[in-house]
Amino acid sequence: MKIEKPIFVVFEGIDGSGKSTLCKSLTEKLTERGIPSVNFTEPTNFETGKYLRKFLRGEIDLERKEQIDAFLNDREESLRQNILPSLESGKNVLLDRYMYSTAAYQSGDDLLPETIIEKNLKKNFKIPDLLFYLDLNPAIALERLSQRKENKERFETLAQLEKIRSAYNRILPKETIRIDGVKGPDEIVQECLEIFLRNFNKKFL
């Protein structure tokens, strides 16, 4: 089975919502069906992304403007080296986090999430064909995170996750597909697979 035009799919959600697992699992499901697909994550594994991960782990501090600039630089590399070449080669691209994460996580009283989205759009970054948002109560997400790893990242507190969830609700476009993150991972993967196939079945040959 081939796709006439590859699809760019983005997964968003607060930490602990299950989006990373979903991104990988859906890629596997599509590949099993003979639909060429690849998944990536932001921040990337390039030097620009490694720099950001140091910030996320609390190893370095960045002013808000520096954070935004760093994410924009990494996103340019993500598109140039990962996303666009894969789409051009005929593969669907499934991406764990994109510009909406930057707007939700890096916004504050001195920089609104809407302004961060505008900064991304001015860069002419590619708009996803499908945007999934895993919605989950921050308290449940935090409990999941506490069971998963010892070292917290700087945004993994209840107050921060509540702020981030609120910011997401402000900036996600109306066509965003919202998924209940309380559901089991297998159920969520199946739901997203059906949505993918239903929306783009006309493009299958």
From Swiss-Prot:
The record ties this protein, via InterPro entries, to: P-loop_NTPase, Thymidylate_kin-like_dom, Thymidylate_kin_CS, Thymidylate_kinase
- Transferase listed as a keyword: yes
Q: Name one GO cellular component term.
A: cytosol
Q: Which GO terms describe its molecular function?
A: ATP binding; dTMP kinase activity
Alphabetical UniProt keywords? ATP-binding, Kinase, Nucleotide biosynthesis, Nucleotide-binding, Transferase
**Catalysed reactions, as listed in the record:** dTMP + ATP = dTDP + ADP
Superkingdom of this entry's organism? Answer: Bacteria
EC class: transferase
Q: Does the keyword Disulfide bond apply?
A: no
Residues reported in the UniProt entry to bind ATP: 13-20
Pfam families in UniProt:
Thymidylate_kin (PF02223)
**Record-listed E.C. numbers:** 2.7.4.9
A Gene Ontology biological process in which this protein takes part is:
dTTP biosynthetic process
Q: Which family does it belong to?
A: Belongs to the thymidylate kinase family.
Function comment: Phosphorylation of dTMP to form dTDP in both de novo and salvage pathways of dTTP synthesis.
Alphabetized PANTHER family for the sequence: THYMIDYLATE KINASE (PTHR10344), UMP-CMP KINASE 2, MITOCHONDRIAL (PTHR10344:SF4)
Protein's name according to its UniProt entry: Thymidylate kinase
Organism encoding this protein: Leptospira borgpetersenii serovar Hardjo-bovis (strain JB197)
